[in-house]
Structures are given as C-alpha cells and as structure tokens.
C-alpha cells in the first residue's frame, strides 16, 4: 500500500523528513528504555 516509493520520483525533503522521524523515534525508544531501567533500579533499592 505505497510503502515502497518509486525511486524515480523521490523528493529529497521527504527522504530527510523520513530520516528525521526515524531518528526521533529511535531516541524516544532509547529514552523510554532508560526510564524503565531507572525505575527498575529505584524499585530494587527500596
């Protein structure tokens, strides 16, 4: 369903936005994992 864009018509801005969204998503994942880890350690110290 249009998941793979035709390489003949690729808008550089779209590519940049895609990379940006990927990077943001990756950072959010990492942050939430760090948060989970921190919560775990806090629970263990109590």
UniProtKB/Swiss-Prot annotation:
The family database entries (Pfam families) matched by this protein are listed as: CRF
Single GO MF annotation: hormone activity
Q: Which residues carry this modification: Isoleucine amide?
A: 46
Return the GO cellular component terms, semicolon-separated.
Answer: extracellular region
* Sorted UniProt keywords: Amidation, Hormone, Secreted
Q: Which family does it belong to?
A: Belongs to the sauvagine/corticotropin-releasing factor/urotensin I family.
What the protein does comes down to: Regulation of fluid secretion. Stimulates primary urine secretion by Malpighian tubules and causes a dose-dependent stimulation of cAMP levels in the tubules.
- Which protein is depicted? Diuretic hormone
Identify the species of origin. Answer: Zootermopsis nevadensis (Dampwood termite)
Q: What is the lineage of its organism?
A: Eukaryota, Metazoa, Ecdysozoa, Arthropoda, Hexapoda
């Amino acid at each position: 369903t249009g998941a793979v864009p035709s390489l003949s018509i690729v808008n550089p801005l779209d590519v940049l936005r895609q990379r940006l969204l990927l990077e943001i998503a990756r950072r959010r994942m990492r942050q939430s994992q760090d948060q989970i880890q921190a919560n775990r350690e806090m629970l263990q110290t109590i």
